[in-house]
Amino acid sequence: MRLWKSMAWGILLWHSQSGALCPAWPPARAAEEITRLQQQLADWNDIYWKQGVSAVDDSVYDQLSARLVQWQRCVGQDVSSTPVSPPLNGTTMHPVAHTGVRKLADRQAVEQWMRGRSELWVQPKVDGVAVTLVYQNGKLTRAISRGNGLQGEDWTPKIRLIPSIPQTTQGALANAVLQGEIFLQREGHIQQRMGGMNARSKVAGMLMRQDNASALNSLGIFIWAWPDGPANMPERLSQLAKAGFSLTNKYTLAVKDASEVERARQSWLTSALPFVTDGVVIRMAKEPASQHWRPGQGDWLAAWKYPPVAQVAQVSAIQFSVGKSGKITVVASLVPVILDDKRVQRVNIGSVKRWEAWDIAPGDQILVSLAGQGIPRLDEVVWRSRERSKPVPPDSHFNSLTCFYASATCQEQFISRLVWLGSRSALGLDGMGEASWRALHQTHRFEHIFSWLALTSAQIANTPGFAKGKSEQIWRQFNLARRQPFTRWIMAMDIPLTQAALQASGDRSWEQLLMRTEQHWRQLPATGERRAGRVIDWRDNPQIKTLSRWLAAQHIPGFGS
């Protein structure tokens, strides 16, 4: 299918001073779009933390939050108000602040961060809800949600109902502050295959609801920080394991370089684990005293997240393609995103009717994943731009019997027909892709789909963009095409039959084909009444008849007398 020239470029891009890719919006629109997205994230955030219900997938929320920060930086706006933390209803102070964790983009960033740091360990980044556990005199006295890192909700009554969390401790842990992740216990969870399952939202929902004490049995705890604990990491892990926090010991590995981090990351991505993860965390054994911990200032640890299975992508344009059969397909051009090491910059939406149902316009944010064979797939629209500037689709008068001859309105279907006839399913013209056909047609102004047969070697050589070797190859391919059997030429003319049916017909000339009745076509493999009627319509089409006479004049096998 070829792209329709009339397309809507609704969102141009520019690079900000920070290097971010920015939409080229007027200031008023930028302010409006930022405010709308900020409010939507705040609403989702409020529902999530107050009701324990996720109105949007965790990954989508995270990516849209990052998109908001990007936009704010583009216009030089303060990003401190971005709603990435829960609304502050809780007033219980954390004895030790939650620092959060810096995100590293790739292995190179990991190598750079590790440089100059020693005694490093890696842990899975368990996907759940962060909590502070406070033990005093050997008993669990308080459990506090992360909140804004300084204060949060008092979750003590709920946490005491979770069987996997020790209610008593001894030794150094008798009086200790622990930070960790409450997670949904899984049996044999393989992250690469099963994904995130919205685990974070499920955990939050269980902790927020008042009538689900039995559901808390499915929750576990992974301790990732013991502020002011033993300086020696093996000793720290051993004591945690003895106290009942065994997962920390099992899933904390010493690492010396980025290669070891990468191996652990890949292993945990593909192995069966008891929890959902979204990456790994690298941390130094040596940590500052807890009184120095502040939100956003934990420079002794960093995260390397897994690439998301689906990416939020920004629609930059809507394009229309017309195939050889006249079918119009809508394609969304995207600001490029990376999925499974594949650069994705366009996704097929489908028919015009489906596009209208999706209501997608340039500037919208859509969720894209990879379907079978790595083909980009549209999953959902996660955010719509305020401005709904949509292009007008081309006229829908195209069909399987239009555009065998070139015209202004037939440009794209005509090119599609040329690409088809050059494919291995028809004449097998090696090296003749869409770009080559466009160059020849634009230079020599083909009258119909077989006009290229009349080109001379000099004309091909003089086509802009064709090197000597390429023009000679094309000339050879065009000459070889003349020797192709009759059935290949009929396929090139887009007869509505399969190759198997055409071979079964036994026709080896245009004269034989003209003698066939509709009843004859019905008897061929995979050819019912409807298709047989289409064959008759195709054969009797004036353009097809004219092309058959033209091919006869060119002495193509099967078309002469």
Curated annotation (Swiss-Prot):
Active site: 125
InterPro entries: DNA_ligase_AS, DNA_ligase_B, DNA_ligase_CS, DNAligase_adenylation, DNAligase_N, NA-bd_OB-fold, NAD_dep_DNA_ligaseB, NAD_DNA_ligase_OB
Keywords: DNA damage, DNA repair, DNA replication, Ligase, NAD
Superkingdom of this protein's organism: Bacteria
Catalytic activity: NAD(+) + (deoxyribonucleotide)n-3'-hydroxyl + 5'-phospho-(deoxyribonucleotide)m = (deoxyribonucleotide)n+m + AMP + beta-nicotinamide D-nucleotide
Keyword match Ribonucleoprotein: no
A Pfam family of this chain: DNA_ligase_OB
Enzyme class: ligase
GO BP annotations listed: DNA repair; DNA replication
One of the record's GO molecular function terms: DNA ligase (NAD+) activity
Protein EC: 6.5.1.2
Family, per entry: Belongs to the NAD-dependent DNA ligase family. LigB subfamily.
HAMAP family named among the record's database cross-references: DNA_ligase_B
Function: Catalyzes the formation of phosphodiester linkages between 5'-phosphoryl and 3'-hydroxyl groups in double-stranded DNA using NAD as a coenzyme and as the energy source for the reaction.
Protein name as annotated: DNA ligase B
Gene that this sequence comes from: ligB
